Regions:
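Amide-forming acyltransferase catalytic core, primarily the GNAT-like/NAT-type
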Residues: 1-98
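Active-site/acyl-donor-binding loops of N-acyltransferases
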Residues: 1-22, 77, 84, 88-108, ...
Length: 189
């Protein structure tokens, strides 16, 4: 299973902002409170059978030593954090680095905020990566992300998902369902 690019084009960002209303039940705040992010991930993360795909120390290190200027948006319902996104700008695009939410409604609210940033900064769109049929890929599709269905053109590159292990190939480690492939864990992002 290869990792693929997902995207929302700038025109789609404008569509999202012009034809969807802001949900007043949610408040989105830009901050870097790592404890809130880890609590959201622990409570609402994609795969409950993965104990912890990164630690508080890893997240602190990653945000303290960025390759890019990371921005974190946390969505609250009342006083309760119910989702977050971490993103950065690169080469005229907004890259979604990490994400988690309690519901489709929350994820669409967060994507709407990213769409506003995309429009305000005159970016080409929002991009990220995931395995298409994984939980992450399904989340992105529900949030309005698309994939290029053609073999040529922009964002068609496959990013190989390779597992190097001394265990037999039929091991559960070799199943894509045992892995949570998110951009924050990719070395180059």
């Amino acid at each position: 299973a290869d990792v693929k690019y997902f995207f929302i084009h700038a025109l789609h960002c404008k569509w999202i902002n012009n034809f969807t209303t802001e949900d007043r039940n949610f408040n989105i705040v830009e901050k870097t409170d790592i404890h809130v992010i880890l609590d959201i991930q622990k409570n609402f993360g994609f795969k409950k059978n993965i104990k912890q795909h990164y630690s508080k120390e890893f997240l602190k290190w990653r945000l303290a030593n960025p390759r890019f200027n990371y921005r974190c948006f946390i969505c609250y319902q009342g006083q309760n954090p119910v989702g977050y996104v971490i993103c950065y700008e690169d080469e005229g695009k907004l890259f979604l680095l990490d994400y988690c939410s309690i519901s489709v409604k929350v994820q669409k609210t967060l994507i709407r905020r990213l769409s506003q940033i995309c429009i305000k900064s005159k970016l080409k769109g929002i991009i990220t990566i995931a395995i298409p049929k994984s939980e992450e890929g399904k989340w992105l599709k529900k949030a309005g992300f698309l994939r290029n269905p053609f073999k040529k053109g922009p964002l068609t590159t496959n990013i190989p998902f390779m597992i190097l292990t001394d265990q037999k190939p039929e091991s559960q480690l070799c199943s894509k369902d045992q892995w949570q492939v998110t951009p924050i864990c990719h070395d180059a992002l």
